[in-house]
A protein has these predicted regions:
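Acidic/His-rich structured neighborhood in mature extracellular/periplasmic domains
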Residues: 93-174
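C-terminal motif of bacterial Sec signal peptides marking the signal peptidase cleavage site
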Residues: 19-22
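Bacterial N-terminal signal peptides that target proteins for export
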Residues: 1-11
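N-terminal mature-domain "stem" immediately C-terminal to a signal peptide or N-terminal signal-anchor/transmembrane
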Residues: 24-96
Length: 174
């Protein structure tokens, strides 16, 4: 019994040593020559920039600027029906959502940490370079930030959405 334990322990030790010393290649590929163009839009800033004066036309402009995300955000995530808004009730609802105390607190807390995305943009650019390295034929997705949605998701084949409020950290009051 003792001899079989020694053999098993020796085998495990040999396996670990083999794993540790067998990998001599660098841990990450060289992406210094990889070029990508990063498109980053701030949906949360555009949404919360709505003003009471003529918010109906401002919401129309948002729908034009975010043709894939806008219906996905409000229909799929929010559960609103965008199909028949001839009365403007949906736009009134969106305005009330933006003005609600919860939405305002969420937006304000997010802006305290993420008003400037310069460092995040650098990390994202590096990630997209790795993406291009491993998938050279794939389309680099447009990146859109927002709040009050799942942490990260794709909408369509070329849109990557990141919900910044999900990354506020453990000290966030929200």
């Amino acid at each position: 019994m003792i001899q079989s334990n020694i053999i098993a322990s020796s085998f495990c030790l040999f396996g670990w040593l083999l794993l540790i010393f067998s990998c001599k290649s660098p841990s990450a590929p060289d992406i210094s020559g990889v070029t990508v163009t990063l498109q980053l839009k701030r949906f949360e800033k555009d949404l919360f920039a709505l003003t009471e004066h003529d918010y109906h036309s401002q919401i129309d402009a948002l729908q034009q600027k975010y043709p894939v995300l806008f219906p996905f955000y409000f229909e799929e995530i929010g559960g609103w029906n965008l199909a028949n808004d001839s009365t403007g009730a949906l736009k009134d609802s969106i305005w009330k959502y933006v003005q609600s105390p919860f939405s305002q607190a969420l937006y304000d807390s997010t802006m305290l940490q993420y008003s400037n995305l310069a460092s995040f943009e650098g990390e994202l650019l590096q990630s997209m370079k790795y993406f291009r390295y491993y998938f050279p034929e794939a389309v680099i997705p447009e990146v859109v930030t927002l709040i009050n949605a799942p942490p990260a998701f794709t909408a369509g084949n070329d849109l990557l959405c990141i919900s910044l409020d999900k990354y506020l950290g453990p000290t966030s009051a929200l």
